[in-house]
Curated annotation (Swiss-Prot):
PANTHER family, A to Z: 2-DEOXYGLUCOSE-6-PHOSPHATE PHOSPHATASE 1-RELATED, FRUCTOSE-1-PHOSPHATE PHOSPHATASE
Catalytic reactions on record: 2-deoxy-D-glucose 6-phosphate + H2O = 2-deoxy-D-glucose + phosphate
Purpose: Phosphatase that is active on 2-deoxy-D-glucose 6-phosphate (2-DOG-6P), as well as on fructose-1-P.
Biological process (GO), any one: carbohydrate metabolic process
Gene that this polypeptide is encoded by: DOG1
Signal peptide region: none
Database matches in Pfam families: Hydrolase
Record-linked Gene3D superfamilies: HAD superfamily/HAD-like, Putative phosphatase, domain 2
Protein name per its UniProtKB record: 2-deoxyglucose-6-phosphate phosphatase 1
pH dependence of this protein's activity: Optimum pH is 6.
InterPro entries: HAD-like_sf, HAD-like_SPP, HAD-SF_hydro_IA, HAD_sf, PGP-like_dom2
Note: Present with 752 molecules/cell in log phase SD medium.
Length: 246
């Protein structure tokens, strides 16, 4: 068991909160066959990357003017393969627990967590209208369309951090601590580059890959992560039976 404190929590979405790997791979494979691209080669580079970056790299002839290529693919993921999408175990409970003061059991006035995803707004927002409806979309929500540089660049996480600090009136507070939850090496690297504690989830990659990327803790899923204290002074997070390199 391990415990650490944090002021703000930042979450990746696909593979961290929502299990979308099967849906995404089916949609990408379909597109690969249409354009004669080797899916296995694409999958070496697609996870955690922005859709528009993958399209530019592997489908240079596809028309992505005004992101219409991105939207077409991600609508396919959201609708054609919705039956393969599920929540990462423990995700809903963890997010809901971050909304409650552990001392008073009352809902906090402002959320201390945000989403930072490489996906498009259409796809990312859709999960909060379906399988994450009970949680509801957070105010601070950074998508792949909101940043110039995708992960492993820390731009997305840094932007979410700054917006949360502004919303929570923490801009003048020094030595704030942050935690990033991620399933992809590029996301772990982005979190570390921002100076955050990083928790890797092995939904998409082996634990060794996440440790090599710099993960401070690695878990199988979010049932191993719980909030033991949450109030105006910060958050204390407990990681139960974290995985080890051995």
């Amino acid at each position: 068991m391990a415990e650490f404190s944090a002021d703000l929590c930042l979450f990746d979405l696909d593979g961290t909160i929502v299990s979308t790997t099967v849906a995404a791979e089916k949609a990408w494979t379909k597109l690969c066959y249409e354009y004669g691209v080797d899916p296995s080669e694409l999958f070496k580079h697609s996870h955690g990357a922005r859709t528009q970056e993958v399209l530019r790299r592997f489908f240079p002839k596809l028309d992505d003017t005004d992101n219409k290529g991105v939207l077409a693919l991600e609508k396919d993921i959201a609708h054609s393969y919705l039956d393969t999408v599920s929540l990462i175990p423990g995700a809903e409970n963890l997010l809901l627990s971050l909304d409650v003061d552990t001392e008073t059991q009352k809902k906090l006035p402002e959320r201390k967590w945000a989403i930072v995803t490489s996906g498009s707004p259409y796809l990312a927002f859709s999960w909060f209208e379906t399988i994450l409806k009970n949680v509801g979309k957070p105010k601070v929500f950074i998508t792949g369309f909101d940043v110039k540089n995708g992960k492993p660049d820390p731009e997305g996480y840094s932007r979410a951090r700054d917006l949360l600090r502004q919303d929570l009136q923490l801009t003048g507070k020094q030595d704030l601590k942050y935690v990033v939850f991620e399933d992809a090496p590029v996301g772990i690297k982005a979190g570390k580059a921002m100076g955050a504690i990083t928790v890797g989830i092995t939904s998409s990659y082996d634990k060794s890959v996440l440790f090599d990327a710099g993960a401070d803790y690695v878990v199988c899923d979010l049932t191993q992560v719980s909030v033991v204290k949450n109030n105006e002074n910060g958050i204390v997070i407990q990681v139960n039976n974290p995985l080890t390199r051995a």
